[in-house]
Amino acid sequence: LDEDNDCRMKDVIPVFEKEVFLERLKRIASIIEMPYNEVVQKFIDRYSGRLRHSVSYMLGASNFYMPIFEEALETYGLPLELKYLPVIESALNPTAVSRVGATGLWQFMLATGKRYGLEVNTLVDERRDPIKASYAAANYLSDLYKVFGDWNLVIAAYNCGPDQINKAIHRSKGSKD
């Protein structure tokens, strides 16, 4: 028996029918709409396939970060589902920097981070501080909800900026769909 080859666990990628995902999404109690469509399926395929090892890292990191996110969101009375935003924004990497300069778990742009009290200078970048950035993000999300009143628009505005969402609403003649 060659232990190295015969006893090694194989990386199995589970495959589920569309109905399984639909049923699981229906069972999630949330005030934030969670649609299932081709784009969602594409991300499910990506994260259960070639990015599977990233998911392992994120699951491990979530044990540390999720309680911080939850506390900040609860402080501002926000839906706890928003704790998954940094998973999408940064893959739970506190040192992540996007191609446009958004930094940290919550991917704050410089001006937005400073507007929400995060210190950024040559010595420190609090956008990378999990606790301070989480409270700043919760404050920002709360402000966005006061403006848009719809969680899908809030999430979109968080990602691309409120000005872009306002322009899209204006182009669609006021429709928020």
Where on the chain are the PLM-derived regions?
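An acidic, Gly/Ser/Thr/Pro-rich helix-cap/linker signature
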Residues: L1-Y76
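Substrate-binding clefts and substrate-entry loops adjacent to catalytic sites
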Residues: F43-Y57, L92-A102, Q107-L153, I169-D177
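Solvent-exposed, polar/charged alpha-helical surfaces in well-ordered, non-transmembrane soluble domains
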Residues: P67, E71, K83, Y135-S142, ...
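Membrane-interface junctions
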Residues: T75-L78, V147
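Short, functionally critical alpha-helical segments immediately adjacent to catalytic or ligand/cofactor-binding
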Residues: L78-T95, V154-N159
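Active-site-adjacent helix/loop patches that line small-molecule binding or acyl-intermediate pockets
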Residues: P162
